[in-house]
Amino acid sequence: MIDRYKHQQLRIGLVSPQQISAWATKIIPNGEIVGEVTKPYTFHYKTNKPEKDGLFCERIFGPIKSGICACGNYRVIGDEKEDPKFCEQCGVEFVDSRIRRYQMGYIKLTCPVTHVWYLKRLPSYIANLLDKPLKELEGLVYCDFSFARPITKKPTFLRLRGSFEYEIQSWKYSIPLFFTTQGFDIFRNREISTGAGAIREQLADLDLRIIIENSLVEWKQLGEEGPTGNEWEDRKIVRRKDFLVRRMELAKHFIRTNIEPEWMVLCLLPVLPPELRPIIQIEGGKLMSSDINELYRRVIYRNNTLTDLLTTSRSTPGELVMCQEKLVQEAVDTLLDNGIRGQPMRDGHNKVYKSFSDVIEGKEGRFRETLLGKRVDYSGRSVIVVGPSLSLHRCGLPREIAIELFQTFVIRGLIRQHLASNIGVAKSQIREKKPIVWEILQEVMQGHPVLLNRAPTLHRLGIQSFQPILVEGRTICLHPLVCKGFNADFDGDQMAVHVPLSLEAQAEARLLMFSHMNLLSPAIGDPISVPTQDMLIGLYVLTSGTRRGICANRYNPCNRKNYQNERIYETNYKYTKEPFFCNSYDAIGAYRQKRIDLDSPLWLRWQLDQRVIASREVPIEVHYESFGNYHEIYAHYLIVRSVKKETFCIYIRTTVGHISFYREIEEAIQGFSQACSYDT
């Protein structure tokens, strides 16, 4: 088994046949070595027990039930007094049944088989190392043609081929004729090589260091040559140089990881533990089996057939043997990666078999679904909605999600306050949703942050911590300013919520991951908590005001015409004099009493420095009063002067929206200044 404390990473690579044998074989107490799967059977149809030496054999993979052998005998696991440690009749050890989750077996292949990942996947590692075309290697692997072994001292087939050329145009077609001759098997095995065995021989003869040296020399020679002037030839040179670089890198990787190239050709085929390819009984007594079991059975059937052809009959035609070797190669290819050679293999219901590659790759594969992104406890998921009244570091959790996430903490609180005698009573109170439950839940949530995450997590700000509060409904409320870090919007996006359990995780969430501590982008340093989308539209509406300017009166015929056009569409609108207010509180109060609108223009008394008023600006209008005072009306402000031209007061032309926006900014600045003064 993999120790989680010693092993912190997982890597897929090549292993030697000796390592596969060490993983799969075991010695039972009577000295017998078991581990090889020789029969393509699973369960006996009468006894419903695993077949001996089959794909679910209890001698190889361990007992189905802990401490119970195939005969039905029982022994206490771990008891030193119990003797023997295995059943002498069936050979099953008395161990825990969990061994069937990691105990492997193996199939001893009669002929070598190339691993399809290293042959057909692009780039082809076997083709790169041998520096041969992929089509040529495929023809050799699948027994479409053969090649002669180099033998110098003895007569070879190459020396005899001249006598057949007058009858057969191509001498390679004469090889199958020799294969059908009785007693020619010795000569054939000595001189003719085909299938994956031929690939294995060539890979075993490779010297990786010489490959690196020769490739480097050729790469330098190609680099010294200048452009040929022919575009096609120049492209061929560039492709050849790229190939040489890949070949050198591949050879260096094999040397660095102590991997032999011939390991890409399999002699022993590992068999997965039975719990990873189960057979399940469903309603009605029917059995459901993993597709991998059927693919393993196909491999064993064809391998046993090849063994019988080679051992039982010496007069077997060579073409039949080559055809059976090809079937074994195709069966192993289908087991490892169904459909990689073209049309995938299907069952009787025209359903594609799910191979080993299909099990581990993709979003629903073993790695991404179970190992990397598996679902965890103390987590939930829901749609996010905007929470404008929330603080930047807070989020709103629905009651339904919060009570599930913090259920254990609420149970502990109920028991500590002697409101429940045990866990069962506490759970019943939670199901009944008593008021005391929500009070304890709020106390728990005040001291416990939560983590919000939106997939995909492309950078550090994709997961941040927040202080949760209870909200009604079934959606998570989020402050709109933190959306840019998550790359989220409120059109149906979902976010996951997690509860940090350990003290270290809670400390990290509070000190490093709170949203108000991540205001700048970690990549470029720009502010990331800035208004976007709906907030910008809201600010525009809040500060837009009315389209009628100060000159919209009878003295300006253009604006008067526009005003008359507006009255056509807004028949309920009645022009009124713009009101005057002494302070912002009176203006906001009038808006709340619905005396004015949000974008209605008004005059607000303002403490404005005279120096900011342009001296050359000419007033648009001047209104005189009976006592001699007069009003100078400008584009955006109004000055009240006395007869002696002394300034009494200044009014600015604004709206309630502008006033509200200004007050929010002023309060935020004052709060920030107070916080800074407290820190100093």
Curated annotation (Swiss-Prot):
Zn(2+) binds at residues 69, 71, 87, 90. Mg(2+) binds at residues 489, 491, 493. Its cofactor is Mg(2+); Zn(2+). Keywords: Chloroplast, DNA-directed RNA polymerase, Magnesium, Metal-binding, Nucleotidyltransferase, Plastid, Transcription, Transferase, Zinc. It catalyses: RNA(n) + a ribonucleoside 5'-triphosphate = RNA(n+1) + diphosphate. Gene3D superfamilies: 1.10.40.90, 2.40.40.20, RNA polymerase II, clamp domain (4.10.860.120), RNA polymerase Rpb1, domain 3 (1.10.274.100). It holds the Pfam family RNA_pol_Rpb1_1. Its EC number is 2.7.7.6. It is found in: Plastid, Chloroplast. GO terms for biological process: DNA-templated transcription. DNA-dependent RNA polymerase catalyzes the transcription of DNA into RNA using the four ribonucleoside triphosphates as substrates. In plastids the minimal PEP RNA polymerase catalytic core is composed of four subunits: alpha, beta, beta', and beta''. When a (nuclear-encoded) sigma factor is associated with the core the holoenzyme is formed, which can initiate transcription. This is DNA-directed RNA polymerase subunit beta'. It comes from Capsella bursa-pastoris. The lineage of its organism: Eukaryota, Viridiplantae, Streptophyta, Embryophyta, Tracheophyta. The gene is rpoC1.
